[in-house]
């Protein structure tokens, strides 16, 4: 599929707003170049705010998901000085509890570990995982490897404040 994203993140501010749009097709079961008869246009508006102490990133997204359901996702992520990120999220959409099945809505926790912590040499790579109690169609987003906010996160107000404080120590 195709994906695009825009982000407005004023320098020195703790907030950012963005939008993404994705046109995707479902691949054939044999994983070759064919597609199934399913395509969807998804998109979300997002707002991010980074609280200063302790460093917590709050994100809210609203839009259309892969199952053509409409709703919102809310995330809170604690960012530790080591670069470790631990977060939780939940998604509420127009899919009824009866349609969604057990669990009623999508939810889970995420963990991101910088490989720098585990290796003897410097690395910018990160190992990330998301744990969900159940996988259902409702509330699922396109999995984009790296969004714009995460790409500029090291230049956020919280990161700059932390770096400056370390420089002065």
Regions found by a protein language model. Name each.
Residues 1, 17-25, 29, 55-65, ...:
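Transmembrane beta-strand segments that form the barrel wall of outer-membrane beta-barrel proteins
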Residues 33-37, 169:
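Outer-membrane beta-barrel initiation region
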Residues 103-169:
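Outer-membrane beta-barrel "beta-signal"
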Residues 28-32, 42-44:
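Outer-membrane beta-barrel translocator/pore domains, especially the C-terminal barrels
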Residues 1-3, 11, 28, 37, ...:
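Solvent-exposed loop/turn segments connecting transmembrane beta-strands
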Residues 12-13, 52-59, 82-93, 120-134, ...:
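Short flexible/disordered coil segments
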Residues 2-21, 41-51, 70-90, 106-115:
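Feature captures outer-membrane beta-barrel proteins of Gram-negative bacteria and organelles
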């Amino acid at each position: 599929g195709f994906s695009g994203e825009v982000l407005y993140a004023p320098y020195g501010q703790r907030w950012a707003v963005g939008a993404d749009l994705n046109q995707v097709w479902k691949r054939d079961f044999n994983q070759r170049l064919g597609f199934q008869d399913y395509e969807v246009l998804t998109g979300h508006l997002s707002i991010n705010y980074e609280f200063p102490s302790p460093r917590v990133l709050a994100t809210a997204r609203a839009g259309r998901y892969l199952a053509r359901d409409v709703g919102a996702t809310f995330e809170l992520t604690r960012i530790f000085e080591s670069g470790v990120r631990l977060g939780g999220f939940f998604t509420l959409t127009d899919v009824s509890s009866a349609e969604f099945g057990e669990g009623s809505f999508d939810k889970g926790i995420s963990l991101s570990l910088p490989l720098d912590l585990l290796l003897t040499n410097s690395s910018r790579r990160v190992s990330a995982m998301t744990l969900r109690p159940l996988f259902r169609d409702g509330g699922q987003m396109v999995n984009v490897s790296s969004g714009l906010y995460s790409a500029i996160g090291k230049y956020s107000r919280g990161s700059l404040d932390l770096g400056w404080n370390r420089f002065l120590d």
